[in-house]
């Protein structure tokens, strides 16, 4: 029996309050309105940014259905939708691409002005949500809300992908992989023969390493205080791994000594102010490029001596690896299917959706790279 045009009752993980576990609830998901798409989720990754909402280091309205790194199948579409149809495999996009705003029209930049990242509303574009639970409206999360068996997104926040793609793997392209990989190949524009340093070896940091290797870097130095992550980093392309705790001097000085004055490209993939500074200073003063990839804490400022930049260093940042989402996500899935990069090594755990709190425990304990929840 078709569910198009009807309210769907399903399971979702609702975060009612900060610092609390997710609650598996029976929710109602309303049909998509004009220019909206309802998706039956198949798989979703668990990302550190979701946990930032739990801890309130990232502000977003609650109660909410979180999750933003998923893949699924279109169940129904609202009036006027032309880019996808029921049955299509899709990836929801936490960075939408309206195609009309100043940023979407820019040849390089990607953070569409209709995003829900800068000042989160926790709604779809029309200012409302399609989720209700116990008679109460439940907020969306950054245009996606993948921690639900069904979700509704704006058409500008969904991309059709290869119908043969394995959704339990390519869901990582919805956030973590693309963010890291793009930071290397698109934002920094790593060059063949160059030297790179990557601070932080979670799923995004390892994806930076994959990108540096794909771009032809000659040396990729992985930096983390957890030595258990070194083997995986080397498997994916790191040529050396170092632990800052093994040295009595600042890690930027160690890297400068290792690389004749500093690396060509450095990446901070943790979200700490001190490592952002270390990453900046570890790249060469005259030609280095440092990229902020990790999400920093809310309402904190970074103080840097301007002389650190005056001699020629560049300091950059980008969301979603600088990729224009609707244009790039289908191409990235095609590249994965063509074996141009791996995703499997990033997935350390696959759990049923109902075990979402166990997945977050693994994340917080540093025991997982990416956990994929399946519906």
Swiss-Prot record:
**UniProt remark on cofactor binding:** Binds 2 Zn(2+) ions per subunit.
Tell me the compartments it is located in.
Cytoplasm
Q: Which UniProt keywords apply?
A: Acetylation, Cytoplasm, Metal-binding, NAD, Oxidoreductase, Zinc
The protein in question is named Alcohol dehydrogenase 1
Q: Name one GO cellular component term.
A: cytosol
Binding annotation for Zn(2+) 2 = 98, 101, 104, 112
Task: Write the gene name.
Answer: ADH1
Q: SUPFAM superfamilies annotated for this entry?
A: GroES-like, NAD(P)-binding Rossmann-fold domains
GO BP terms: namely: retinoic acid metabolic process; retinol metabolic process
Pfam families in alphabetical order? ADH_N, ADH_zinc_N
């Amino acid at each position: 029996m078709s569910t198009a045009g009807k309210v769907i009752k399903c399971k979702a993980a609702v975060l009612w309050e900060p610092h609390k576990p997710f609650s598996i609830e029976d929710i109602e998901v309303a049909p998509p309105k004009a220019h909206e798409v309802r998706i039956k989720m198949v798989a979703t990754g668990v990302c550190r940014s979701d946990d930032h909402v739990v801890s309130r280091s990232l502000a977003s309205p609650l109660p909410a259905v979180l999750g933003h790194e998923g893949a699924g199948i279109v169940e129904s579409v609202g009036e006027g939708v032309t880019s996808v149809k029921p049955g299509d495999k899709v990836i929801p996009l936490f960075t939408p691409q309206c195609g009309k705003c100043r940023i979407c029209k820019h040849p390089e930049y990607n953070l569409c002005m209709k995003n829900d990242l800068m000042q989160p509303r926790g709604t779809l574009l029309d200012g409302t949500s399609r989720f209700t639970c116990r008679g109460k409206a439940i907020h969306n999360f950054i245009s996606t809300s993948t921690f639900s068996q069904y979700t509704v997104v704006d058409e500008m926040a969904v991309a059709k992908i290869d119908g043969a793609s394995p959704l339990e793997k390519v869901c990582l392209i919805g956030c973590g992989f693309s963010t890291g990989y793009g930071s290397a190949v698109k934002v920094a524009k790593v060059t063949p023969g160059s030297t790179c340093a990557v601070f932080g070896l979670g799923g995004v940091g390892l994806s930076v390493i994959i990108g540096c290797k794909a771009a032809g870097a000659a040396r990729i130095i992985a930096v983390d205080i957890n030595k258990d992550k070194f083997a995986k980093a080397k498997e994916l392309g790191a040529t050396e791994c170092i632990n800052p705790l093994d040295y009595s001097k600042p890690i930027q000085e160690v890297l400068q000594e290792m690389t004749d004055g500093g690396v060509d490209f450095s990446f901070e993939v943790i979200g700490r102010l001190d490592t952002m500074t270390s990453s900046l200073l570890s790249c060469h003063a005259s030609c280095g490029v440092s990229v902020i990839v990790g999400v920093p804490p809310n309402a904190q400022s970074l103080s840097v001596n301007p002389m650190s930049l005056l001699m020629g260093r560049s300091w950059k940042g980008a969301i979603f690896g600088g990729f224009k989402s609707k244009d790039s996500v289908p191409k990235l899935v095609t590249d994965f299917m063509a074996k141009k990069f791996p995703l499997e090594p990033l997935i350390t755990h696959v759990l049923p959706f109902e075990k979402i709190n166990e997945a977050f425990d693994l994340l917080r304990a540093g025991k997982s790279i990416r956990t994929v929840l399946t519906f």
